[in-house]
Amino acid sequence: MAKLTKKMKAIKAGVDSTKAYEINEAIAVLKQFATAKFVESVDVAVNLGIDPRKSHQNVRGATVLPHGTGRTARVAVFTQGENAEAAKAPGADLVGMEDLAEQIKKGEKNFDVVIPSPDAMRVVGQLGQVLGPRGLIPNLKVGTVTPNVVEAVKNAKSGQIRPRNAKNGIIHTTIGKADFAPEQLKDNLVALLAALNKAKPTTVKGIFIKKVSISTTMGAGVAVDQASL
């Protein structure tokens, strides 16, 4: 087992793992220990009261955070004709069909989001082995397969996140950067939780959002008192 560095020991000593912090206090604790030489991301882990073994209880969705994530996504759009030109206006980084698919197969292009129009799914379907491991397979439910590629690109560029639960029923995503104002981080967290509640499966009984923890890239998790949100 790797030894804890002095910094990690200090962080762990400064966070009470038995306590759920009021949101403003939680953010203050995060910022206190966000001392890396780069601007750390602020991540969130949400424990859901679901049975992830049941497909109808899995949660996934998409929401645009009010203050973005602090990072601009690189967007690849698969479409043709007028849609191809239109997708460039809101900032699509890569636009194409078979030509783009071949470049991606060869590992020649970097991107964070894939958006195809419905007629392009026949092309994107060939990229399952590349997109699958990265969790980038487009999905109609979260709006990444759409005839309105312009709107989808705008959303992706505006800080849209696409949370989905892991096999343990926990959702991991980002809600901003450590240099965001406290109110911005709070607003983003509230928006995320509202989106998750909206996506709650009808078959889930009891408490849906069981625990919320926030952390920075190099920091420890801080549990948040949901009553303070």
Swiss-Prot record:
Kindly give the CDD domains that the UniProt entry links to this protein: Ribosomal_L1
What molecular function terms (GO) are annotated for this protein? rRNA binding; structural constituent of ribosome; tRNA binding
User: Which GO biological process annotations does it have?
Assistant: regulation of translation; translation
**Keywords from the named record:** Repressor, Ribonucleoprotein, Ribosomal protein, RNA-binding, rRNA-binding, Translation regulation, tRNA-binding
Q: Name one GO cellular component term.
A: cytosolic large ribosomal subunit
Note the subunit structure: Part of the 50S ribosomal subunit.
Q: Which family does it belong to?
A: Belongs to the universal ribosomal protein uL1 family.
What's this chain's function? Binds directly to 23S rRNA. The L1 stalk is quite mobile in the ribosome, and is involved in E site tRNA release.
Q: Which HAMAP family match?
A: Ribosomal_uL1_B
- Name-wise, this protein is Large ribosomal subunit protein uL1
Q: Give the species.
A: Actinobacillus pleuropneumoniae serotype 3 (strain JL03)
What does UniProt list as this organism's lineage? Bacteria, Pseudomonadati, Pseudomonadota, Gammaproteobacteria, Pasteurellales
- Gene name of the encoded protein: rplA
